[in-house]
């Protein structure tokens, strides 16, 4: 993969016109990302939803909750998934997807989302199965408490020092990124909008697994006790990081 410098396709007329963002997956995988994790990553998969929700699985566990496409709001004029969760703090909506693994030692993931109405919590998770082990990582945003947690080696959540605000008065799209190092079984960093936090040395949740090598990302929203909540998921980007 080409991660830096002038690409080998420079000044060559493309043979195929790209019409939708899903079409760039193969191109990105071969040529590398232009701007992911400070230009230090190669894109391996991009999930967007202008062609529908066929690339993901979506569930809602409470009557009245639902997941559907909307263009109000839109992200750069493209539809997003509206994860509508009813007024119940234990009510959850989930959107997730699986894929085949890629042989590498470090990975990153970026979630682009907006949230309207103050949710109880938002979970963004990444699981890799490779080499006979399963590695679980995740970031939790406690919207009502303005907190951030990471999924620790014991399978529970550890708070990250600081105050992290997810505005919910109108649909402002945020970027949440985190990177993990499989080889050293640790987190590397998390980036939430303008917040850059090092998690080097924080161990992943690791367990033996006989499952086929694969990855799985998940977004969960847990509702408010007062009002229905909307999480608008615009895109998910998976990368291999160059370290």
Predicted features and spans:
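Extracellular carbohydrate-recognition regions
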Residues: 2-62
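Short tryptophan-centered beta-strand motifs in secreted/extracellular beta-sheet-rich domains
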Residues: 49, 109-111, 170-182, 188-192
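Extracellular glycan-recognition surfaces and repeat-rich motifs
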Residues: 53-89
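Extracellular/lumenal carbohydrate-interaction signature centered on repeated Trp-anchored short motifs
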Residues: 96-109, 164-172, 229-232
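Short, aromatic/His-centered strand-loop micro-motif at the edge of beta-sheets
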Residues: 152-175
